[in-house]
Amino acid sequence: MTNDTQYKRHKTVLKEESRRTIQINKSWGGRFNEPTDEFVKIFGASIFFDKILAPYDIQGSIAHATMLQEVGLLTENEKNKIIKGLERILSEVKTGEFKWSITLEDIHMNIEARLVKMIGDTGKKLHTGRSRNDQIVTDIRLYLRDQVDDITNEIKRLQLVLADLAEKETNTIMPGFTHLQAAQPISFGHHMMAYFEMLARDVERLFDCRKRINSMPLGSAALAGTTYSIKRTRTAELLGFERICLNSLDGVSDRDFVIEFLSTASIIMMHLSRFSEELILWSSAQFNFIELPDSFCTGSSIMPQKKNPDVPELVRGKTGRVYGNLTSLLTIMKSQPLAYNKDNQEDKEPLFDTVDTLKACLRVFADMIPTIQIKRDNMYNSTKQGYTTATDLADYLVNKGLPFRDAHKVVGKSVAYGIEHQKDLSELSLEELQAFDSRIENDVFEILSLEGSLNARNHLGATSPNQVKQAIKIARKTLK
């Protein structure tokens, strides 16, 4: 939503709020003599999008209040009143009863104002020893920690779907490609497990990213810490943080943990985009390897015959959106002096959008993949084209004592002969093959078969059905 659209949408609400609230923000307006410009209120407000952080803001405030009581800055009664008030506010947020105010700018002041209205002046004590600067970055870390866990689970669900499909299609032969040209026969199950492995590394990156997310900045206050005798380790314990940020300037000013997540998300989307591209190609009439289900496709308003692969196309397109969010935040951060600057308000929308986009793409892929129809015969027949067993013939000659470079040359000539006579290598007679090298014997035809080519690659990580089955077995253990 543009700021101009926001202004038009909320102008009436803002005027109504202005009639029943003072014109200068009470949370910071002590040194101001003029009210904030009407448009600037909307231009500078973040409540349009940061209200998603409400549960985390309240979670952080409850932990902060508990710590304040334990160090003697709140009484037991004050702490209890604050926590009960915050719990009521959380309930209002969840049920939709909470009334968000643009004049209160952001999530923090909206919740604090409601708390003060509920419990009186005791609510004003909650902000002791903290700033919105360390409060917001704590909220983001709590939010992102949960989202990383959710995304990890979505990836593992997709991995399970891929492993199941790979197991069904272990013996399904398809052409493996380089430069989008048929190269060698592979198992379709092996191809699916390639994406399983990519996603496995994505999970590792998320796990590693989570370590740096899980560091608590609360207690950094505005930038220099606080004069109160707070116990940051206690607050970290209450919030489940593994460590605390050891430099208050760094704690409030950097967003590298968000950038790291966006980078990881971009890599995940890149993997999904590559997969999408292949599904789009395979479902085309030119390849005809798979049939996408009607429920994941749409048609054309003018061409009755069309069945468009919208879901993989959208995932491919949304990859650019996530890349853009990463670039956006890198650009926002690149020239900021320490510590906090208002620029950092722009960190949230790229983050929230990336989280929502990534989760949606993972979910739709996990739902779609099991419903795809595999056209095994078409895959097999396509593999028979393009001389995909040429390397096998070269390896055969090497095993007969010919140096590989010489074998490569011999097979190249035999392929040229096959092209001229419109025959695959497996369709050449023994006499025709022996014309290129006398060491070729009748056993070559097993080597030149697609099944023979597949079975010959029987080592760890290769495409033989036996190795694919072992890979799936190992992969399933990582999902437990």
UniProtKB/Swiss-Prot annotation:
Main location: cytoplasm
E.C. no: 4.3.2.1
Subcellular location field: Cytoplasm
Pathway where it operates: Amino-acid biosynthesis; L-arginine biosynthesis; L-arginine from L-ornithine and carbamoyl phosphate: step 3/3
Keyword vocabulary terms for this entry: Amino-acid biosynthesis, Arginine biosynthesis, Cytoplasm, Lyase
Reactions it catalyzes: 2-(N(omega)-L-arginino)succinate = fumarate + L-arginine
Cross-referenced CDD domains: Argininosuccinate_lyase (cd01359)
Enzyme class of the recorded protein, top EC level: lyase
Any one cellular-component term (Gene Ontology): cytosol
The organism's place on the tree of life at top rank: Bacteria
Biological processes annotated in GO: arginine biosynthetic process via ornithine; L-arginine biosynthetic process
A GO molecular function held by the record: argininosuccinate lyase activity
PROSITE patterns: FUMARATE_LYASES
Family to which this protein belongs: Belongs to the lyase 1 family. Argininosuccinate lyase subfamily.
UniProt-recorded name of the protein: Argininosuccinate lyase
Natural source organism: Ruthia magnifica subsp. Calyptogena magnifica
